[in-house]
Regions:
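Active-site-proximal, Lys/Arg-enriched surface segment
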Residues: 63-136
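Basic, short loop/linker segments at the boundary and entry of helix-turn-helix/winged-helix-like folds
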Residues: 1-30
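Short, conserved catalytic/metal-binding motifs centered on acidic residues
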Residues: 28, 43-46, 62, 66, ...
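Electropositive, glycine- and tryptophan-enriched low-complexity nucleic-acid-binding patches
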Residues: 122-173
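An anionic, glycine-rich sequence signature occurring as long contiguous blocks
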Residues: 198-295, 352, 379-406
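DNA-recognition alpha helix
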Residues: 40-55
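Short amphipathic alpha-helical "interface-anchor" segments enriched in bulky aromatics
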Residues: 43, 273-307, 312, 316, ...
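A short, flexible helix-boundary coil/loop motif
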Residues: 50, 226-236, 320-406
């Protein structure tokens, strides 16, 4: 309720429908993700109807209805839902907003319909699928905004990144630095970030032969030990095609099986130490961990090959992730570091009796719960009561939730 769920749903731009409201449909899609039902068709297999009840239904809507609802969401409205949601989540304190990770993610399609192809990151083959690009708050690991597109030749680092970062900047005006992989190390893009958006960047360099020779040209005495490793580090000024002026090239030298090797990073950050910049670059792997954590939510389970349905479903999955992030933050302690799946197992996956009693919805847990589960849920509800967040829920007959453990 504190997120302003009605305003969020309005941002989808769906006209008022007879019967089932857009709000109820959105709630079902969000809750299905949170309980690990990766596809809308899995909703029909749920035997416990608490999910339906909390969305205001007597039973789960059919998969055909949910697909029809997704058909109503345009790509732009799905993205607008993400933007409005991210701004609401920012107020909840789940973003730090200074350093942003940006990365691409390939969602493979195994059906028979024709769809654009791209190289699969692990199978080393070209196959049909969807390109998704995600921005992530580096310090918290929470997603900010994502965009999907069909693979095509016109999809470049510049036309993907600039519009996305402009949106992220609108959500997080305090953004200072973006960290990404070597696909993004393109002069025209880095020029725009440096000169037009006043952003710092850190990117892994493409190891072309001329770059390797440039790294080898650094005198040995300029290398120093990289603390905490058996590697050496140095830096020099360098240039990049389509970038006006110079930038810093940070070089790491190491030996592997007796062979001298190098890798390097490009950055326009002359204020931070080279070690700090490498540390920030290493945290880019948080976005890889995010992709793994999202398997539970079904981020890669395409609802269709239609881009509008994919964008709509993606918006719901990102909302689900950040909703759980708010829950982790409110619970505190050991729960803050748990994955979405672990939160489900520790907090949500417990059978309970749900009954209405006057102006209350009484949720009663009968054994089989852990003491930590009981303490966490009671702490959470107490916080809701103290802050006024346990407000009457309109789609549940204007009733408040009450918890009991027996």
């Amino acid at each position: 309720m504190k997120l302003g769920i009605y305003q969020l749903v309005t941002s989808l731009g769906i006209k008022k429908q007879e019967g089932i409201s857009a709000l109820q449909s959105v709630l079902v899609l969000i809750f299905l993700a949170i309980i690990g039902k990766k596809r809308v068709s899995k909703g029909e297999t749920i035997k416990y109807y608490g999910i339906a009840a909390i969305a205001g239904f007597s039973k789960m809507p059919s998969k055909s209805y949910l697909h029809k609802f997704l058909d109503l969401i345009t790509v732009s409205c799905g993205e607008n839902f993400q933007i409005v949601s991210a701004k609401a989540f920012k107020k909840m304190g789940i973003f730090k907003g200074k350093i942003i990770n940006l990365d691409g993610h390939f969602i493979a399609y195994f059906g028979k319909s024709k769809i654009g192809k791209d190289k699969h990151p692990t199978r080393n083959i070209s196959m049909g699928g969807i390109k998704a690009f995600f921005s992530q708050d580096q310090e918290t690991g929470n997603p900010i905004f994502a965009r999907v597109a069909y693979p095509r030749k016109g999809l470049t680092p510049e036309n993907v990144t600039i519009p996305m970062l402009q949106i992220v900047k609108d959500i997080l005006p305090e953004m200072e630095k973006v960290v990404f992989d070597k696909w993004f190390s393109v002069g025209s893009l880095l020029e725009y970030l440096d000169k037009k958006m006043n952003l710092k960047y850190v990117t892994l360099i493409k190891l072309y032969e001329n770059r390797i020779e440039e790294m080898k040209s650094i005198p040995t005495e300029e290398f120093r030990p990289l603390i905490g490793s058996d590697r050496l580090i140095a830096f020099k000024d360098t240039t990049l095609r389509n970038f006006s002026g110079g930038m810093k090239l940070i070089v790491v030298r190491f030996f592997e099986d007796g062979i001298e090797k190098y890798y390097g990073y490009l950055t326009n950050d002359y204020e931070s130490s080279e070690e700090q910049i490498l540390d920030e670059k290493s945290w880019r792997w948080r976005i890889e961990n995010f992709f793994k954590n999202c398997d539970f939510l079904g981020m890669d389970a395409l609802p269709s090959i239609e881009l509008n349905k994919i964008a709509g479903m993606l918006a719901m999955k990102i909302f689900s992730f950040n909703l759980v992030a708010c829950l982790r933050k409110d619970l505190g302690g050991e729960f803050e570091k748990m994955t979405v799946e672990s939160i489900f197992e520790e907090i949500i996956e417990f059978p309970a009796l749900v009954k209405t009693n006057g102006d209350k919805i009484v949720v009663t847990f009968y054994g089989n719960y852990k003491d930590s589960h009981k303490a966490a849920v009671q702490k959470l509800l107490k916080k809701f009561d103290e802050t006024g967040m346990n407000a009457p829920i309109s789609w549940m007959g204007d009733r408040r939730i009450e918890l009991k453990f027996k």
